Amino acid sequence: MVMNTDYLDTLPEIKNRFKVDLQPEEKVVFTAKPWAFSTEKGDLLGADDARITMTNRNIIADNGNGIWVTDIAEDVVDMRKQESGKFLTKQVYILVTLNKEVTYGIGIQKLNGYQFHFHKKDMAVFEEIIRHMAY
């Protein structure tokens, strides 16, 4: 799947709530405080203090201890809503799949993507954005 990042350029700029550093021509199009974010396998990376910012170029995930910057055009191969579990164990999240393995921590831990566990309102907004991005 190819991500249509041109769509992000058409979105209005919103407030840079989490004061992320921006490059020239980069604008914030989405911000949220998820209830959690984790690796693609579910290993917790951040919880209540986590902050997610999407610009027209990058996804920036900050857990308060470290910042992951992912170039959407270069690094992301897929973004989609996923559901796992049933009833009380049901989880709904956005799965971001990367085109290469990334190491983190002290360099031994690896991930190939992220799970963003947004609150319902933020989930709907993010879903609408990624719906327009998939070719």
How does the language model describe each region?
Residues 1-52, 135:
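Anionic N-terminal interaction surfaces
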